[in-house]
A protein has these predicted regions:
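Bacterial Sec-dependent N-terminal signal peptides
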Residues: 1-28
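Solvent-exposed coil/turn segments that connect beta secondary-structure elements
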Residues: 42-44, 79-81, 88-90, 130, ...
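Short, solvent-exposed secondary-structure boundary motifs
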Residues: 59-69, 101-108, 126-133
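Short, cysteine-centered beta-strand-loop-beta hairpins and adjacent loop/turn segments enriched
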Residues: 47-50, 90-94, 132
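Helix-rich interaction surfaces within compact, conserved domain-sized segments
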Residues: 23-32, 111-175
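Mid-length scaffold segments of soluble, non-membrane domains
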Residues: 67-118
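N-terminal secretory signal peptides
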Residues: 24-86
Length: 175
C-alpha cells in the first residue's frame, strides 16, 4: 500500500513539474502592451445567490459558485481597434432583456477606453466600452505566465468573474 501511495505521489509531482505556462513572460508583455490578445474563459464564478447555489449543488463534485467552461468557445478578443466579448452570464439581472439572444456578455465595441498598468508580477488591464448598450467595465488581472482573471461590472447585473488564460490571436487564413 505504501508503494502504491509513493507511486501516485511521484506521478502527481512529475505532472505538476511538467505543467506548462500558457505564455512566456515576453509574449505576455508583448500582447498586453500591443493591445492584441484573446482571453479564453475556463471557469465562471457568479456572485453567491441562494437560488443559484441550489441549482449548482445538484451537480456531482460541485464546488460552490464555480462553473467549468473548459472546452467552450467563450472568450474576449482585444485588438487596438475593437473588443469582442462572448461570455455567459449566470447571476442576477436587474433589468433583463426580452430578447432570448441577448443573454450573457456579448458585444462588439469599436469605441472603448483601454488602460494597462504593470505591477510587480502582473498587469491590471481595464477596458470600458463606450458604444455598448449597458454600461460595462472589464477588469483583467493578468500574470506573467498568461493566466488571467476577468471581473465584469455592469450597471444592470450583478458582477461576475471568470478565470482563464491569454493567447495570441490566430491569424485568419487568406483565400
Amino acid at each position: 500500500m505504501k508503494s502504491l501511495t509513493k507511486l501516485f505521489t511521484i506521478i502527481l509531482a512529475v505532472g505538476a513539474l511538467q505543467a506548462k505556462a500558457q505564455t512566456d513572460k515576453e509574449t505576455t508583455a508583448r500582447i498586453v502592451n500591443a493591445q492584441n490578445f484573446v482571453f479564453n474563459a475556463v471557469t465562471a464564478i457568479p456572485m453567491a445567490d441562494n437560488a443559484l447555489n441550489q441549482v449548482l449543488n445538484q451537480y456531482p463534485n460541485s464546488r460552490n459558485n464555480l462553473l467549468n467552461l473548459a472546452g467552450s468557445q467563450y472568450d474576449v478578443r482585444v485588438t487596438k481597434d475593437s473588443v469582442v466579448a462572448y461570455l455567459p452570464f449566470y447571476s442576477r439581472s436587474f433589468n433583463p432583456s426580452l430578447d432570448p439572444n441577448d443573454s450573457g456578455t456579448k458585444f462588439k465595441s469599436k469605441d472603448f477606453k483601454y488602460s494597462a498598468e504593470k505591477k510587480k508580477k502582473h498587469w491590471i488591464v481595464t477596458i470600458e466600452p463606450k458604444d455598448v448598450r449597458d454600461s460595462q467595465k472589464l477588469i483583467f488581472n493578468i500574470t506573467e505566465k498568461g493566466y488571467a482573471s476577468l471581473s465584469i461590472q455592469n450597471i444592470n447585473r450583478q458582477p461576475m468573474s471568470f478565470n482563464g488564460n491569454l493567447s495570441e490571436p490566430k491569424e485568419k487564413k487568406k483565400n
